[in-house]
């Protein structure tokens, strides 16, 4: 490892989450599958004002790839990843609620992760980072929330992997959550999702620059991360959308050597190829490979049924008053049947549940790109509280 790595790893991702506050929440943190962290830092951002009795708290857990910058703020005017959902007079109204978005444990945007410095070794954790689970994420978030002096969450919001964390949080810390919004998520990973993520991890590990996780931060395995992102994109969106959006359109100006299968090509032949490349290159430059591996595997491992012998029994441990469960028909990564199962389980737990199947062509990413239909449902839910 190069001598510059120690200093570089501390700052390399900060430019992607400059508005986050990083708080030390524990001197040590035991992980569910063994091992411990020698210090636990959590990154978060807030919007709105906390009322006097602290009864207006909304907490948002993110999916795998976003930072805590969910919306623009006075500190950072850059639009957030859910800017159309969160803000004054928006579905999650920062004029009424104190909104906290937490960067997930294991992510490279401020919270303790494989890129963090292990104080005992003065080196980045890298793959010496203990095995990470969704439950670890939930427990770390709970420590942060307690550190902020908050005992009760008015509404807990979780899309995708964030929904898994929200479910775990509601079971493990069941006196802390009043209401919940779960979007395009599940109580466990299905074979298709596990297969896709296993391939993503494999291409990262097969990148020669990965070096069994001890790569130089000056020469990270960008190619592996780039291809992994492309694989992910094929599961995040729907084939129906891509037929309408791209069809068989070809790019302009591409010089194609057919016998080299793209080795010397100056561009991609089809627009869909160019689109995937554009999205993947953006991602490879902002996300750490080891963090991706840990977060991806945590999703595969998650099974809420482990907390009650069955999903129904696990959900019966929650104390949620009202819940909103949303999904879309075109989601292949978290099929709509999985949201229906959450609805049925929470209903048996005597939670007042609203379940909606929304029509969107954008697949799993619908909640990020087709936000108008989601915003309507989320706003109606908040208005009902």
Where would I find each of the regions flagged by the language model?
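Catalytic-loop region of hydrolases
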Residues: 2-60, 74
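N-terminal cap/lid subdomain of alpha/beta-hydrolase-fold enzymes
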Residues: 45, 49-118
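Conserved acidic catalytic loop of the alpha/beta-hydrolase fold
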Residues: 122-124, 128, 135-155
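Alpha/beta-hydrolase-fold enzymes
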Residues: 176, 182-282
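Short alpha-helix in the alpha/beta-hydrolase fold that links the catalytic acid
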Residues: 307-312, 322, 335-345
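Short beta-strand/loop motif that positions the catalytic acidic residue
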Residues: 325-327
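Catalytic active-site module of serine/aspartate enzymes centered on a nucleophile-bearing elbow/loop
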Residues: 341-344, 349-385
């Amino acid at each position: 490892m190069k001598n510059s790595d120690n200093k570089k790893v501390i700052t390399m991702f900060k430019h992607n989450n400059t508005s986050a506050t990083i708080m030390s929440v524990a001197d040590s943190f035991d992980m569910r599958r063994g091992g411990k962290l020698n210090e636990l830092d959590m990154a978060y951002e807030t919007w709105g004002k906390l009322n006097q009795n602290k009864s207006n708290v909304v907490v948002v857990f993110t999916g795998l790839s976003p930072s805590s910058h969910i919306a623009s703020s006075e500190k950072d005017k850059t639009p957030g990843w859910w800017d159309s959902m969160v803000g004054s007079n928006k579905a999650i109204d920062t004029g009424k609620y104190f909104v906290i978005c937490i960067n997930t444990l294991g992510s490279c945007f401020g919270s303790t992760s494989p890129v963090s410095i292990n104080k005992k070794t003065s080196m980045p954790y890298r793959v010496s980072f203990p095995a990470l689970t969704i439950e670890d994420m939930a427990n770390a978030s709970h420590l942060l929330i307690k550190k902020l002096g908050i005992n009760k969450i008015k509404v807990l919001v979780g899309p995708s992997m964030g929904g898994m964390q929200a479910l775990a949080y509601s079971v493990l810390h069941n006196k802390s959550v009043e209401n919940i919004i779960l979007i395009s998520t599940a109580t466990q990973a299905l074979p298709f999702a596990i297969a896709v993520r296993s391939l993503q991890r494999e291409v990262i590990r097969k990148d020669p620059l990965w070096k069994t996780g001890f790569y130089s931060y000056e020469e990270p395995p960008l190619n592996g991360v780039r291809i992994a992102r492309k694989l992910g994109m094929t599961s995040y969106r729907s084939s129906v959308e891509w037929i309408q959006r791209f069809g068989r359109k070809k790019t302009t100006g591409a010089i194609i050597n057919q016998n080299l299968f793209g080795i010397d090509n100056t561009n991609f032949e089809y627009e869909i190829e160019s689109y995937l490349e554009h999205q993947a290159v953006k991602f490879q430059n902002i996300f750490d490979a080891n963090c991706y591996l840990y977060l991806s595997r945590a999703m595969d491992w998650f099974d809420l049924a482990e907390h009650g012998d069955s999903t129904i029994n696990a959900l019966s441990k929650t104390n949620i008053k009202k819940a909103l469960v949303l999904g879309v028909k075109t989601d292949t990564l978290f099929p709509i049947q999985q949201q229906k199962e959450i609805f049925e389980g929470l209903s048996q737990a005597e939670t007042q549940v609203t379940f909606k199947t929304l029509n969107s062509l954008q697949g799993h990413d619908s909640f990020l790109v087709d936000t108008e239909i989601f915003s309507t449902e989320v706003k109606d839910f908040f208005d009902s509280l």
